[in-house]
Protein backbone atom coordinates (compact mmCIF):
# COMPACT_ATOMS: atom_id res chain seq x y z
CA UNK A 1 0.00 0.00 0.00
CA UNK A 2 1.32 3.45 -0.92
CA UNK A 3 1.12 6.41 1.46
CA UNK A 4 2.02 10.10 1.42
CA UNK A 5 2.89 11.72 4.74
CA UNK A 6 3.92 15.30 5.50
CA UNK A 7 5.81 16.07 8.70
CA UNK A 8 5.12 19.30 10.57
CA UNK A 9 8.50 20.55 9.36
CA UNK A 10 7.40 20.36 5.72
CA UNK A 11 9.40 17.22 4.91
CA UNK A 12 7.43 14.87 2.62
CA UNK A 13 7.59 11.08 2.91
CA UNK A 14 6.36 8.82 0.09
CA UNK A 15 6.06 5.21 1.24
CA UNK A 16 5.16 1.94 -0.41
CA UNK A 17 5.22 -1.43 1.33
CA UNK A 18 6.88 -4.25 -0.60
CA UNK A 19 7.20 -7.58 1.20
CA UNK A 20 8.28 -9.54 -1.89
CA UNK A 21 11.86 -8.27 -1.58
CA UNK A 22 13.74 -7.93 1.71
CA UNK A 23 15.82 -4.92 0.66
CA UNK A 24 14.83 -1.25 0.90
CA UNK A 25 15.06 1.39 -1.83
CA UNK A 26 15.43 5.04 -0.80
CA UNK A 27 15.51 8.30 -2.74
CA UNK A 28 16.05 11.68 -1.10
CA UNK A 29 15.34 14.52 -3.55
CA UNK A 30 15.90 18.22 -2.97
CA UNK A 31 13.97 20.68 -5.13
CA UNK A 32 16.78 22.70 -6.73
CA UNK A 33 19.15 21.56 -9.49
CA UNK A 34 20.81 23.53 -12.28
CA UNK A 35 17.86 25.91 -12.68
CA UNK A 36 19.05 27.40 -9.36
CA UNK A 37 22.67 27.94 -10.44
CA UNK A 38 22.28 31.61 -11.30
CA UNK A 39 25.39 33.07 -12.95
CA UNK A 40 27.57 30.20 -11.71
CA UNK A 41 26.53 27.49 -14.15
CA UNK A 42 27.34 24.09 -12.67
CA UNK A 43 27.03 25.20 -9.02
CA UNK A 44 24.34 22.63 -8.14
CA UNK A 45 26.33 19.75 -9.60
CA UNK A 46 29.45 21.04 -7.85
CA UNK A 47 27.62 21.12 -4.50
CA UNK A 48 26.59 17.49 -5.01
CA UNK A 49 30.29 16.63 -5.38
CA UNK A 50 31.18 18.65 -2.28
CA UNK A 51 29.02 16.48 -0.03
CA UNK A 52 31.64 13.76 -0.50
CA UNK A 53 34.70 15.86 0.39
CA UNK A 54 34.71 15.48 4.16
CA UNK A 55 32.83 16.44 7.33
CA UNK A 56 34.11 17.89 10.60
CA UNK A 57 34.78 14.31 11.79
CA UNK A 58 35.35 12.29 8.60
CA UNK A 59 37.89 12.64 5.81
CA UNK A 60 37.00 12.60 2.11
CA UNK A 61 37.92 8.91 1.91
CA UNK A 62 35.93 8.02 5.03
CA UNK A 63 32.79 9.80 3.78
CA UNK A 64 32.91 8.00 0.43
CA UNK A 65 33.56 4.64 2.07
CA UNK A 66 30.68 5.14 4.48
CA UNK A 67 28.18 6.21 1.79
CA UNK A 68 29.12 3.61 -0.81
CA UNK A 69 29.31 0.80 1.74
CA UNK A 70 25.61 0.05 1.32
CA UNK A 71 24.39 -2.39 -1.37
CA UNK A 72 24.07 0.22 -4.12
CA UNK A 73 24.16 3.98 -3.68
CA UNK A 74 24.45 6.99 -5.93
CA UNK A 75 23.86 10.73 -6.15
CA UNK A 76 23.01 12.88 -9.15
CA UNK A 77 22.03 16.37 -10.23
CA UNK A 78 19.45 17.26 -12.87
CA UNK A 79 17.81 20.48 -14.05
CA UNK A 80 15.16 20.05 -11.37
CA UNK A 81 16.78 18.45 -8.32
CA UNK A 82 19.74 16.98 -6.46
CA UNK A 83 19.12 13.39 -5.41
CA UNK A 84 20.66 10.75 -3.15
CA UNK A 85 19.61 7.16 -3.89
CA UNK A 86 20.25 3.92 -2.08
CA UNK A 87 19.39 0.23 -2.34
CA UNK A 88 20.16 -1.03 1.13
CA UNK A 89 19.59 -3.81 3.63
CA UNK A 90 16.38 -2.85 5.40
CA UNK A 91 18.00 -3.10 8.82
CA UNK A 92 20.40 -0.32 7.77
CA UNK A 93 17.75 2.28 6.82
CA UNK A 94 18.41 4.38 9.92
CA UNK A 95 22.15 4.29 9.20
CA UNK A 96 21.61 5.43 5.60
CA UNK A 97 19.37 8.32 6.65
CA UNK A 98 21.90 9.39 9.28
CA UNK A 99 24.74 9.17 6.75
CA UNK A 100 23.06 11.52 4.27
CA UNK A 101 22.03 13.89 7.05
CA UNK A 102 25.62 14.01 8.31
CA UNK A 103 26.96 14.75 4.81
CA UNK A 104 24.48 17.61 4.39
CA UNK A 105 24.75 19.18 7.83
CA UNK A 106 28.37 18.55 8.78
CA UNK A 107 30.39 18.83 5.56
CA UNK A 108 33.06 21.49 6.00
CA UNK A 109 33.10 22.77 2.40
CA UNK A 110 36.59 24.11 3.08
CA UNK A 111 38.35 26.32 0.56
CA UNK A 112 41.02 23.66 0.03
CA UNK A 113 38.37 20.99 -0.64
CA UNK A 114 36.64 23.30 -3.12
CA UNK A 115 39.88 23.85 -5.04
CA UNK A 116 40.62 20.12 -5.04
CA UNK A 117 37.13 19.23 -6.28
CA UNK A 118 37.32 21.81 -9.07
CA UNK A 119 40.00 19.66 -10.70
CA UNK A 120 37.65 16.66 -10.65
CA UNK A 121 34.64 18.52 -12.07
CA UNK A 122 36.68 20.37 -14.72
CA UNK A 123 38.07 17.04 -15.88
CA UNK A 124 34.50 15.71 -16.07
CA UNK A 125 33.50 18.67 -18.27
CA UNK A 126 36.54 18.27 -20.53
CA UNK A 127 35.95 14.53 -20.94
CA UNK A 128 32.23 14.90 -21.71
CA UNK A 129 32.15 12.96 -24.99
CA UNK A 130 28.45 13.50 -25.56
CA UNK A 131 28.42 17.29 -25.23
CA UNK A 132 26.66 17.91 -28.58
CA UNK A 133 23.81 15.60 -27.58
CA UNK A 134 23.62 17.27 -24.15
CA UNK A 135 23.46 20.76 -25.64
CA UNK A 136 20.90 19.63 -28.21
CA UNK A 137 18.73 18.00 -25.56
CA UNK A 138 18.84 21.04 -23.29
CA UNK A 139 17.98 23.46 -26.11
CA UNK A 140 15.27 21.14 -27.42
CA UNK A 141 13.58 20.68 -24.06
CA UNK A 142 13.52 24.39 -23.38
CA UNK A 143 11.93 25.03 -26.78
CA UNK A 144 9.44 22.21 -26.22
CA UNK A 145 8.23 23.17 -22.76
CA UNK A 146 9.39 26.78 -22.30
CA UNK A 147 10.34 25.88 -18.74
CA UNK A 148 13.14 27.97 -17.26
CA UNK A 149 14.95 24.99 -15.74
CA UNK A 150 15.69 23.54 -19.18
CA UNK A 151 17.78 26.58 -20.13
CA UNK A 152 20.69 25.50 -18.02
CA UNK A 153 23.23 22.72 -18.30
CA UNK A 154 24.05 20.60 -15.28
CA UNK A 155 27.85 20.48 -15.61
CA UNK A 156 28.44 24.17 -16.28
CA UNK A 157 31.62 25.36 -17.99
CA UNK A 158 35.29 25.30 -17.01
CA UNK A 159 35.14 29.08 -16.54
CA UNK A 160 32.08 29.13 -14.26
CA UNK A 161 33.18 26.15 -12.17
CA UNK A 162 36.58 27.75 -11.56
CA UNK A 163 34.78 30.82 -10.15
CA UNK A 164 32.94 28.84 -7.43
CA UNK A 165 34.04 29.57 -3.87
CA UNK A 166 33.50 27.90 -0.51
CA UNK A 167 31.03 30.67 0.35
CA UNK A 168 28.99 29.95 -2.80
CA UNK A 169 28.67 26.29 -1.81
CA UNK A 170 27.73 27.07 1.79
CA UNK A 171 25.08 29.61 0.75
CA UNK A 172 23.55 27.19 -1.79
CA UNK A 173 23.37 24.33 0.72
CA UNK A 174 21.97 26.58 3.44
CA UNK A 175 19.20 27.77 1.13
CA UNK A 176 18.09 24.55 -0.57
CA UNK A 177 19.14 21.64 1.66
CA UNK A 178 16.41 22.00 4.22
CA UNK A 179 13.76 19.50 5.27
CA UNK A 180 10.86 21.54 3.90
CA UNK A 181 12.50 21.33 0.45
CA UNK A 182 12.97 17.55 0.50
CA UNK A 183 10.91 14.53 -0.59
CA UNK A 184 11.97 11.10 0.66
CA UNK A 185 10.63 8.09 -1.26
CA UNK A 186 10.98 4.67 0.37
CA UNK A 187 9.93 1.23 -0.85
CA UNK A 188 10.50 -1.32 1.89
CA UNK A 189 9.17 -4.39 3.74
CA UNK A 190 9.31 -2.32 6.94
CA UNK A 191 5.98 -1.05 8.26
CA UNK A 192 4.83 2.50 7.59
CA UNK A 193 4.87 3.32 11.30
CA UNK A 194 8.43 2.08 11.65
CA UNK A 195 9.65 4.04 8.60
CA UNK A 196 7.90 7.20 9.73
CA UNK A 197 9.66 7.04 13.11
CA UNK A 198 13.06 6.31 11.59
CA UNK A 199 12.80 9.24 9.18
CA UNK A 200 11.70 11.56 11.97
CA UNK A 201 14.50 10.50 14.33
CA UNK A 202 17.43 10.16 11.95
CA UNK A 203 16.66 12.87 9.39
CA UNK A 204 13.74 15.19 10.07
CA UNK A 205 14.71 16.24 13.60
CA UNK A 206 18.35 16.84 12.66
CA UNK A 207 17.81 18.83 9.46
CA UNK A 208 17.37 22.62 9.35
CA UNK A 209 14.34 24.44 7.95
CA UNK A 210 13.85 27.86 6.41
CA UNK A 211 11.06 29.86 4.79
CA UNK A 212 11.90 28.65 1.27
CA UNK A 213 8.76 28.36 -0.83
CA UNK A 214 8.31 25.55 -3.39
CA UNK A 215 9.98 26.47 -6.66
CA UNK A 216 7.38 26.96 -9.40
CA UNK A 217 7.43 25.39 -12.83
CA UNK A 218 8.12 28.84 -14.26
CA UNK A 219 7.48 29.20 -17.96
CA UNK A 220 7.79 31.82 -20.66
CA UNK A 221 5.05 32.81 -23.09
CA UNK A 222 4.88 30.49 -26.08
CA UNK A 223 5.54 32.10 -29.46
CA UNK A 224 2.98 30.59 -31.82
CA UNK A 225 4.63 31.59 -35.09
CA UNK A 226 7.99 29.95 -34.31
CA UNK A 227 7.11 26.29 -34.65
CA UNK A 228 10.19 25.44 -36.71
CA UNK A 229 13.39 26.18 -34.81
CA UNK A 230 16.96 25.84 -36.03
CA UNK A 231 20.03 26.01 -33.81
CA UNK A 232 22.97 26.07 -36.24
CA UNK A 233 26.14 24.41 -34.94
CA UNK A 234 29.43 23.48 -36.57
CA UNK A 235 28.99 19.73 -36.20
CA UNK A 236 28.63 16.95 -38.79
CA UNK A 237 25.09 15.85 -37.94
CA UNK A 238 21.67 17.07 -36.89
CA UNK A 239 19.43 16.22 -33.97
CA UNK A 240 15.88 16.30 -35.37
CA UNK A 241 12.71 16.29 -33.26
CA UNK A 242 9.10 16.42 -34.38
CA UNK A 243 7.04 17.31 -31.33
CA UNK A 244 3.29 17.26 -30.68
CA UNK A 245 2.54 19.45 -27.66
CA UNK A 246 -0.74 19.18 -25.82
CA UNK A 247 -2.12 21.45 -23.12
CA UNK A 248 -3.31 18.41 -21.19
CA UNK A 249 -1.49 18.08 -17.86
CA UNK A 250 -0.20 15.07 -15.97
CA UNK A 251 -2.45 15.07 -12.91
CA UNK A 252 -5.11 12.93 -14.60
CA UNK A 253 -4.05 9.33 -13.96
CA UNK A 254 -6.06 7.92 -16.85
CA UNK A 255 -4.56 10.43 -19.29
CA UNK A 256 -1.09 9.50 -18.05
CA UNK A 257 -1.92 5.86 -18.76
CA UNK A 258 -3.22 6.75 -22.23
CA UNK A 259 -0.16 8.81 -23.18
CA UNK A 260 2.20 6.15 -21.85
CA UNK A 261 0.41 3.45 -23.85
CA UNK A 262 0.36 5.55 -27.02
CA UNK A 263 4.03 6.42 -26.61
CA UNK A 264 5.07 2.81 -26.08
CA UNK A 265 3.12 1.56 -29.10
CA UNK A 266 4.54 4.33 -31.30
CA UNK A 267 8.05 3.57 -30.06
CA UNK A 268 7.57 -0.07 -31.07
CA UNK A 269 6.29 0.91 -34.52
CA UNK A 270 8.99 3.55 -35.01
CA UNK A 271 11.67 0.87 -34.87
CA UNK A 272 10.45 -0.14 -38.33
CA UNK A 273 10.93 3.40 -39.60
CA UNK A 274 14.67 3.17 -39.13
CA UNK A 275 15.06 1.20 -42.38
CA UNK A 276 13.02 3.77 -44.29
CA UNK A 277 15.18 6.56 -42.89
CA UNK A 278 18.51 5.14 -44.05
CA UNK A 279 18.59 7.52 -46.99
CA UNK A 280 21.77 7.93 -49.07
CA UNK A 281 23.92 6.62 -46.21
CA UNK A 282 22.68 9.46 -44.03
CA UNK A 283 23.50 9.80 -40.36
CA UNK A 284 20.42 8.07 -39.02
CA UNK A 285 20.98 5.75 -36.10
CA UNK A 286 17.38 5.04 -35.17
CA UNK A 287 13.97 6.63 -34.86
CA UNK A 288 12.78 6.84 -31.28
CA UNK A 289 9.56 8.04 -29.67
CA UNK A 290 9.38 9.71 -26.28
CA UNK A 291 6.44 10.93 -24.26
CA UNK A 292 6.53 13.46 -21.45
CA UNK A 293 3.83 14.45 -19.01
CA UNK A 294 4.30 17.04 -16.27
CA UNK A 295 2.46 19.69 -14.31
CA UNK A 296 2.49 22.08 -17.27
CA UNK A 297 1.69 20.03 -20.36
CA UNK A 298 2.27 16.76 -22.20
CA UNK A 299 4.13 16.01 -25.41
CA UNK A 300 4.96 13.23 -27.85
CA UNK A 301 8.30 13.44 -29.61
CA UNK A 302 9.73 11.57 -32.60
CA UNK A 303 13.49 11.91 -32.58
CA UNK A 304 16.44 10.92 -34.76
CA UNK A 305 19.93 11.95 -35.85
CA UNK A 306 20.34 12.68 -39.57
CA UNK A 307 22.41 14.47 -42.20
CA UNK A 308 21.14 17.87 -43.39
CA UNK A 309 20.36 16.76 -46.98
CA UNK A 310 17.95 14.15 -45.68
CA UNK A 311 15.93 16.21 -43.21
CA UNK A 312 13.09 16.85 -45.68
CA UNK A 313 12.89 13.18 -46.80
CA UNK A 314 12.94 12.19 -43.14
CA UNK A 315 10.09 14.59 -42.34
CA UNK A 316 8.14 13.13 -45.29
CA UNK A 317 8.49 9.64 -43.78
CA UNK A 318 7.41 10.83 -40.32
CA UNK A 319 4.43 12.78 -41.65
CA UNK A 320 3.30 9.85 -43.77
CA UNK A 321 3.63 7.61 -40.74
CA UNK A 322 1.49 9.88 -38.54
CA UNK A 323 -1.13 10.29 -41.27
CA UNK A 324 -1.38 6.51 -41.56
CA UNK A 325 -1.85 5.72 -37.88
CA UNK A 326 -4.35 8.58 -37.41
CA UNK A 327 -6.39 7.25 -40.34
CA UNK A 328 -6.19 3.55 -39.51
CA UNK A 329 -5.67 3.59 -35.74
CA UNK A 330 -3.64 1.12 -33.74
CA UNK A 331 -4.48 -2.53 -34.33
CA UNK A 332 -5.81 -4.90 -31.70
CA UNK A 333 -2.54 -6.84 -31.98
CA UNK A 334 -0.45 -3.74 -31.21
CA UNK A 335 -2.69 -2.86 -28.27
CA UNK A 336 -2.67 -6.41 -26.87
CA UNK A 337 1.12 -6.49 -27.10
CA UNK A 338 1.35 -3.33 -25.01
CA UNK A 339 -1.07 -4.74 -22.41
CA UNK A 340 1.06 -7.87 -22.27
CA UNK A 341 4.17 -5.78 -21.66
CA UNK A 342 2.30 -3.93 -18.91
CA UNK A 343 1.51 -7.26 -17.20
CA UNK A 344 5.12 -8.39 -17.58
CA UNK A 345 6.55 -5.17 -16.19
CA UNK A 346 4.18 -5.32 -13.24
CA UNK A 347 5.17 -8.89 -12.41
CA UNK A 348 8.90 -8.11 -12.64
CA UNK A 349 8.96 -4.56 -11.30
CA UNK A 350 6.88 -5.33 -8.24
CA UNK A 351 9.78 -7.54 -7.17
CA UNK A 352 12.26 -4.69 -7.62
CA UNK A 353 12.10 -2.06 -4.86
CA UNK A 354 13.96 0.47 -7.05
CA UNK A 355 11.26 0.25 -9.75
CA UNK A 356 8.45 0.64 -7.23
CA UNK A 357 10.22 3.59 -5.63
CA UNK A 358 10.73 5.19 -9.06
CA UNK A 359 6.96 5.23 -9.54
CA UNK A 360 6.54 6.93 -6.17
CA UNK A 361 8.98 9.69 -7.09
CA UNK A 362 6.87 10.80 -10.06
CA UNK A 363 4.83 12.67 -7.44
CA UNK A 364 7.40 15.45 -7.79
CA UNK A 365 6.42 16.05 -11.41
CA UNK A 366 2.65 15.60 -11.26
CA UNK A 367 -0.23 17.05 -9.32
CA UNK A 368 -1.24 13.70 -7.89
CA UNK A 369 0.38 11.00 -5.78
CA UNK A 370 0.05 7.51 -7.26
CA UNK A 371 1.55 4.11 -6.55
CA UNK A 372 2.99 1.60 -9.00
CA UNK A 373 -0.21 -0.43 -8.70
CA UNK A 374 -2.32 2.63 -9.59
CA UNK A 375 -0.36 3.06 -12.82
CA UNK A 376 -0.52 -0.63 -13.68
CA UNK A 377 -4.28 -0.83 -13.11
CA UNK A 378 -4.92 2.40 -15.06
CA UNK A 379 -3.21 0.92 -18.13
CA UNK A 380 -4.91 -2.43 -17.60
CA UNK A 381 -8.32 -0.76 -17.63
CA UNK A 382 -7.90 0.96 -21.01
CA UNK A 383 -9.69 -0.09 -24.20
CA UNK A 384 -8.41 0.08 -27.77
CA UNK A 385 -11.09 2.64 -28.66
CA UNK A 386 -9.99 4.91 -25.79
CA UNK A 387 -6.34 4.68 -26.83
CA UNK A 388 -7.10 5.42 -30.49
CA UNK A 389 -9.34 8.34 -29.54
CA UNK A 390 -6.63 9.86 -27.33
CA UNK A 391 -4.00 9.23 -30.02
CA UNK A 392 -6.06 11.07 -32.65
CA UNK A 393 -6.69 13.94 -30.24
CA UNK A 394 -2.96 14.19 -29.53
CA UNK A 395 -1.95 14.36 -33.19
CA UNK A 396 -4.81 16.50 -34.50
CA UNK A 397 -5.24 19.06 -31.70
CA UNK A 398 -1.69 19.54 -30.47
CA UNK A 399 0.78 22.18 -31.57
CA UNK A 400 3.32 20.72 -34.00
CA UNK A 401 6.91 21.81 -33.52
CA UNK A 402 10.05 20.86 -35.48
CA UNK A 403 13.42 21.36 -33.81
CA UNK A 404 16.79 20.90 -35.52
CA UNK A 405 20.13 21.24 -33.75
CA UNK A 406 23.15 20.84 -36.03
CA UNK A 407 24.69 21.93 -39.31
CA UNK A 408 21.45 22.30 -41.30
CA UNK A 409 20.36 25.59 -42.85
CA UNK A 410 16.86 26.96 -43.34
CA UNK A 411 16.64 25.64 -46.90
CA UNK A 412 17.19 22.10 -45.56
CA UNK A 413 13.97 22.23 -43.53
CA UNK A 414 10.30 22.64 -44.40
CA UNK A 415 8.49 25.67 -43.02
CA UNK A 416 5.70 25.01 -40.54
CA UNK A 417 3.12 25.90 -43.21
CA UNK A 418 4.60 23.32 -45.58
CA UNK A 419 4.54 20.73 -42.81
CA UNK A 420 0.94 21.49 -41.88
CA UNK A 421 -0.14 21.10 -45.52
CA UNK A 422 1.44 17.65 -45.65
CA UNK A 423 -0.56 16.43 -42.67
CA UNK A 424 -3.93 15.02 -43.69
CA UNK A 425 -5.23 15.34 -40.16
Label every PLM stretch briefly.
Residues 10, 28, 45, 84, ...:
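Buried hydrophobic packing residues in well-ordered domains
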Residues 25-89, 151-154, 265-283, 294:
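M16/MPP (pitrilysin/insulinase) zinc-metallopeptidase core fold and M16-derived inactive scaffolds
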Residues 30, 55-56, 60-172, 193, ...:
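Acidic/histidine-enriched segments that form metal/cofactor-coordinating
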